[in-house]
Amino acid sequence: MDTEPDFSIVTPSYNYASYVRECIESVKNQEGATFEHIIQDAGSTDGTLDILNSYPHLKLHVEKDSGMSEGINRGFRKARGKWVMWLNTDDRLLPGALAAVKAFADSRPDADIVHGAWTFIGPDGALQRPMKALPYSLNMHIWYGTYLASTALFLRRSTTIEEGFL
């Protein structure tokens, strides 16, 4: 019997052959947490599917969709992890990311959302600009809005289901 993984990483995909391998490797090499990696591909025609099929650990689903949000929601519906997040094909997780989120989430059983820092990556793959996660403040949210990068946003799956996905 399969046990519930700590995380379900959902990656919407469509014609991103030049980036998808780095995305997959960044998830595959995570340590300190259990995970499943669900790829929702909308029918890529640029070689992306050949790359995806070379990774037997992926849960690959190839289905036409009406856009990225539909692909993400389909992936969320298939997810079994305690926490879900989506990682676009041109994004990647830094080493130790899932272990750090797991440690924090385990220390805060009341949390339904965990958000952390992230770094912009240039077209050449170089890390460019680190962005820090700021403590939540209602005042800051009202006056400046709150930007939550999907690559650093983890949602409790049970809450995501109750609230109706994206």
What are these regions (language model features)?
Residues M1-S26:
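N-proximal low-complexity "stem/linker" segments adjacent to membrane-targeting elements
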Residues V10, P130-L166:
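Conserved nucleotide-sugar donor-binding catalytic segment
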Residues E25-T34:
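Short, acidic, metal-binding catalytic loop of nucleotide-sugar glycosyltransferases
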Residues S26, D41-D50, N88:
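A conserved acidic beta->alpha catalytic loop
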Residues T34-G43, H61-K64:
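Short beta-strand/loop segment that forms part of the nucleotide-sugar
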Residues E63-A79:
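Glycine-rich, basic loop-to-helix element that forms the pyrophosphate-binding segment
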Residues V84:
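Short aromatic/hydrophobic "clamp" motif used to bind/position activated sugar donors
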Residues G96-Q128:
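Conserved donor NDP-sugar-binding/catalytic core segment of glycosyltransferases
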